A protein has these predicted regions:
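Conserved active-site and SAM-binding loop architecture
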Residues: 1-174
Length: 174
């Protein structure tokens, strides 16, 4: 992803992104993947982990009805992600969670409890402030306080941004 590439360019050691849409060994909806990542965390192989949970699985912009299997897959992905976040935090690994600023994900009780318990910093920014043609307000919540320097609000003239529209569908089953 872009964040991984940016970290690599400034000389930080990075791992290949673990992605829901990747090969099965990198699919967070699989218990074996989660167990492996937990073992790496406990072994001290990570200093920081970023979680960008697909917002299309739980989007307020989508009006399509989800099947029971799709809902179960979404819940499994969220449960596994929260388990990994808690594992990282309990082993001294900095954590960053990224999602659109208006996402209802930020209102999930388990995430709110984690954020309070570990004193996360909230960082809001507009993508246009980092060279994107669209505004797209984003939010990071992080235990890495230095990331607060990324906070930016849009200062562009009105109507200059590309309009993001349409409906993106992402398979949530892994």
């Amino acid at each position: 992803g872009r964040l991984t590439g940016a970290c690599s360019q400034i000389g930080l050691r990075v791992a290949s992104p673990v992605d829901l849409l990747g090969a099965p060994p990198a699919d967070l909806s699989r218990p074996a993947t989660v167990a492996e990542l937990k073992s790496w965390t406990v072994a001290g192989l990570f200093w920081h982990a970023t979680f960008a949970i697909p917002c299309t699985c739980d989007s307020i912009a989508s009006h399509s009805r989800r099947t029971d299997d799709e809902l179960a897959a979404r819940q499994r992905l969220l449960r596994h992600t929260f388990q990994l976040i808690e594992c990282c935090l309990s082993h001294g690994v900095y954590v960053t969670i990224a999602n659109p600023r208006g996402s209802r994900r930020w209102r999930r009780p388990r995430l709110r409890r984690i954020m309070r318990r570990f004193k996360f910093t909230v960082v809001d920014y507009a993508c246009c402030r980092f060279g994107c043609a669209f505004r797209k307000p984003q939010r990071l919540v992080t235990t890495l306080p230095d990331l607060a320097r990324l906070a930016r609000t849009c200062r562009c003239p009105e109507r200059i941004h590309e309009e993001l529209s349409g409906k993106a569908e992402v398979e949530c089953e892994g």
